[in-house]
């Protein structure tokens, strides 16, 4: 005989993999393995009519997002680390050239202070982000083995997953601000009182670099988690649990970070032009990197908005049909 678990033959090449799974579950020999209600089946069929949402919530087995299973934590950490490390390198050379070189006997102190701060800040921030990611994955793994997982907690974890990029950006920004305060205070105790402009320059440069670096983790982590972690959280639960408002909130947040991605580099360039008129290298780096980065972020922003529109439309249609 033919097993219902085997892939059906003679299907169109563009037949969605999830539609096949839905129909196979309808024909399961054991009633306990079928859909629990007509409403649940209707929701699944509604999903099949929304290809974009379907690809996000139930990615094909050959999708590269599916193949990344098990690598979520290191990849999220890497997405956050790269822009922050690049911003840190730029900030280090900028501060050394425009602040430290003009202070007597400050080179050794600056090296020791920046080494200490970086050795604390980067592992702490990246470790915290990795831990938040791991919590989501652990809940997803527990849900796979426990068919009676807490519905309310499942909704909370789904919302946390959607905001993972926002949390990453907030953690990064907070650490840059703390570093902006720690650098001048540490330098003050190491070599004595600094000029007032040095305190302002340290704080301002670190805050601006932090705000520039914050947009990249938001878009990178949000897009990645939406396609890799979020599907795992809803695999064994009703994907209609989340109200459309959750997607709308994330769309509004995306606009905030998009504006930040374009505005902050422009403000940084303007500040450099006013304070250091001869610093053509820094202005050039910010101009080129800011432009390329903003264009890249805009592309991700457009894709993310389309993904969220599809999920919001699906959620709205399913919720309206259940009323």
Regions found by a protein language model. Give the residues of each.
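Loop-to-transmembrane boundary segments
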Residues: 65-79, 155-181, 242-266
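Juxtamembrane "helix-exit" motif on the non-cytosolic side of transmembrane helices
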Residues: 89-102, 181-196, 266-278
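Alpha-helical membrane-embedded segments
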Residues: 125-128, 202-221, 280-302
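Hydrophobic alpha-helical transmembrane segments
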Residues: 105-120, 193-208, 270-291
């Amino acid at each position: 005989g033919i097993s219902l678990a085997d892939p059906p033959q003679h299907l169109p090449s563009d037949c969605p993999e999830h539609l096949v799974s839905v129909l196979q579950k309808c024909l399961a020999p054991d009633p306990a393995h079928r859909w629990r209600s007509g409403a649940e089946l209707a929701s699944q069929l509604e999903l099949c009519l929304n290809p974009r949402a379907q690809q996000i919530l139930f990615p094909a087995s050959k999708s590269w997002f599916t193949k990344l299973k098990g690598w979520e934590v290191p990849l999220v950490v890497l997405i956050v680390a790269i822009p922050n490390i690049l911003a840190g390198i730029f900030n280090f050379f900028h501060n050394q050239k425009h602040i430290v070189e003009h202070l007597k006997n400050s080179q050794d102190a600056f090296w020791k202070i920046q080494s200490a701060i970086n050795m604390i800040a980067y592992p702490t921030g990246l470790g915290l982000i990795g831990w938040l990611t791991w919590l989501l994955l652990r809940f997803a793994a527990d849900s796979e083995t426990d068919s009676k997982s807490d519905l309310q907690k499942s909704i909370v974890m789904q919302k946390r997953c959607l905001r993972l990029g926002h949390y990453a950006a907030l953690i990064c920004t907070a650490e840059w601000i703390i570093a902006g305060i720690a650098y001048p205070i540490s330098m003050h105790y190491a070599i004595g009182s600094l000029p007032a402009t040095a305190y302002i320059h340290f704080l301002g440069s670190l805050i601006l670099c932090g705000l520039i670096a914050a947009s990249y983790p938001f878009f990178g982590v949000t897009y990645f988690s939406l396609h890799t972690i979020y599907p795992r959280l809803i695999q064994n639960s009703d994907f209609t649990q989340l109200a459309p408002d959750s997607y709308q909130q994330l769309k509004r947040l995306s606009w905030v970070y998009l504006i930040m991605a374009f505005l902050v580099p422009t403000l940084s360039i303007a500040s450099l032009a006013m304070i250091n008129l001869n610093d053509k290298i820094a202005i050039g780096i910010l101009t080129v990197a800011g432009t390329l980065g903003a264009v890249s972020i805009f592309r991700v922003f457009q894709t993310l908005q389309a993904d969220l529109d599809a999920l919001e439309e699906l959620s709205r249609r399913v919720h309206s049909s259940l009323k």
